A protein has these predicted regions:
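Asp-based, Mg2+/Mn2+-dependent phosphohydrolase catalytic module
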Residues: 1-3, 103, 112, 117-229
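Generic recognition of short, well-ordered alpha-helical segments
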Residues: 18-22, 96, 100, 124, ...
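An amphipathic alpha-helix signature
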Residues: 21-25, 59-63, 119
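Short, surface-exposed acidic
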Residues: 31-45, 70-82, 133-134
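Short, acidic loop-to-helix structural element flanking the phosphoryl-transfer center
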Residues: 60, 84-112, 150
Length: 229
């Protein structure tokens, strides 16, 4: 029996737009740091590479990595300024269909967010989008390993058993494979591929020499969650 619904945040509940990275330009200018287009692109790429090299989010580690990757010496204040700017990057209103899903799930289950980012910034974005009230807790990647590692999901289940929790997310490797391997249930939100919508699929989980098939759902619209839960 499902007791807790765990939502991924970016591109599941609200969009993360490519243009948000333009805040790097603004932050550099406000800090009076000279830069070229190549510098901007390297910093942008460094954020992605950081996630491939580190499993938690730490400001000191992040700026050290960016400086090593870009061969520059940016101040830690750059990260702090970017976090402040990105915390405002959220729509002020979400689609009514998303609100209905949140109201529905909150009326039946414990509802939380599991994000691969800093908690403070994500809470502010949820507040701006006016949906923070739907969540019992926001779990982030500052004090434990991020998705797809088991530790991320174990913190998000709270006092529940893994099988009593279901993860909803758009990243198959991080959200779906990660949660299934940790023993949770999953709904794969795949808005770009309607052919897979409403299908029940099976993930082959290999444990030593045994292979176990685990059921998960695929949807193309968030409102389909109400037909599953």
């Amino acid at each position: 029996m499902i007791k807790r619904v765990i939502f991924d945040m970016d591109n599941t509940l609200m969009p993360w737009k490519t243009e948000y990275f333009s805040e790097i330009y603004t932050a550099l200018k406000e800090l009076n740091i000279g830069f070229t287009e190549e510098d901007f692109l390297k910093i942008k790429k460094a954020f992605s590479e950081y996630e491939n090299n580190y499993y938690t989010f730490n400001t000191k580690l992040m700026i050290d990595f960016i400086n090593k990757y870009t061969k520059k010496n940016y101040p830690e204040e750059l990260i702090e300024k970017l976090m402040n700017k990105w915390s405002k990057c959220a729509p002020e209103k979400l689609p009514e269909s998303t609100i209905k899903v949140l109201e529905y799930t909150k009326s039946k289950y414990e509802v939380v967010v599991l994000t691969d980012w800093y908690k403070e910034q994500q809470v502010k974005r949820l507040e701006k989008a006016k949906i923070l009230k739907y969540f019992q807790e926001v779990y982030a990647a500052e004090n434990t390993k991020r998705k797809p590692f088991k530790e991320a999901f174990m913190q998000a289940i709270g006092e529940n058993k893994p099988e009593e929790c279901i993860v909803i997310g758009v990243d198959f490797q991080r959200d779906i494979e990660g949660s299934l391997k940790a023993g949770l249930q999953a709904i794969y939100y795949n808005p770009n591929n309607t052919e897979q919508s409403k299908k029940i699929s099976f993930y082959n989980l290999k444990n030593n020499e045994e292979t176990k098939q685990i059921k998960y759902y695929t949807i193309s619209e968030l409102k389909e969650i109400m037909n599953i839960l």
